[in-house]
């Protein structure tokens, strides 16, 4: 899962959206640095990552990547799941339009920015103003995201080529998303994540 899915599942679970978004920028035990609700959100994010990586649908999708891109498949798939969520938001969350959800999420996240790591602050400078969560629905933007990550982290250069795997298996990836994501939504609503 990437930014949008973590925020969405956190909302459904009535968990801290701030903590769920912040989690990838926090190493180790967060309990001494953040309030309890944010810590709970960080832990939820980590559980979702482990759960998602071990889903049979996700394990199967990783196998569709070529040998030279399989190492970065988990990262690529996380971004792709956000693509499908953004693209199909109105079906998955018909009572909360995406733009309204984004405003709601941003307000929550802004409350923790003053005490956040610099990299997280930097992310927030772009995430909201450049409308990433809406733009995830566009596959050209997904390609730009993967290229950007590869540029910032040279050891992840294979992300550039992983775009071809997404394109080659687009329909099958969409099918897998619809198989697992509604289940995760139900788990979140029942606070079982």
From Swiss-Prot:
Top-level taxon of origin: Bacteria
Biological process, per Gene Ontology: fatty acid biosynthetic process
GO terms for MF: [acyl-carrier-protein] phosphodiesterase activity
Enzyme Commission code: 3.1.4.14
Pfam families: ACP_PD (PF04336)
Keywords: Fatty acid biosynthesis, Fatty acid metabolism, Hydrolase, Lipid biosynthesis, Lipid metabolism
Catalytic activity reported: holo-[ACP] + H2O = apo-[ACP] + (R)-4'-phosphopantetheine + H(+)
Family per record: Belongs to the AcpH family.
Function field: Converts holo-ACP to apo-ACP by hydrolytic cleavage of the phosphopantetheine prosthetic group from ACP.
Protein name: Acyl carrier protein phosphodiesterase
Organism encoding this protein: Shigella boydii serotype 4 (strain Sb227)
Gene label: acpH
């Amino acid at each position: 899962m990437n930014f949008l899915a973590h925020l969405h599942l956190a909302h459904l679970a009535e968990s801290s959206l701030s903590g769920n978004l912040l989690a990838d920028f926090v190493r180790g035990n967060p309990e001494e640095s953040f309030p309890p609700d944010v810590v709970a959100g960080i832990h939820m994010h980590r559980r979702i990552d482990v759960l998602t990586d071990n889903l049979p649908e996700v394990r199967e999708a990783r196998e569709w990547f070529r040998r030279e891109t399989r190492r970065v498949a988990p990262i690529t798939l996380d971004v792709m799941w956000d693509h499908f969520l953004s693209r199909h938001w109105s079906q998955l969350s018909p009572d909360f339009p995406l733009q309204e959800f984004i405003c709601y999420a941003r307000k929550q996240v802004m409350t923790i920015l003053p005490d956040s790591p610099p990299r997280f602050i930097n992310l927030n400078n772009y995430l909201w103003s450049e409308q990433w969560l809406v733009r995830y629905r566009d596959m050209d933007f997904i390609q730009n995201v993967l290229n950007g990550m590869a540029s910032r982290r040279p050891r992840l250069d294979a992300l550039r080529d992983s775009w071809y795997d997404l394109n080659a298996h687009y329909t099958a990836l969409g099918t897998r998303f619809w198989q697992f994501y509604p289940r995760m939504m139900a788990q979140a609503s029942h606070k079982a994540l």
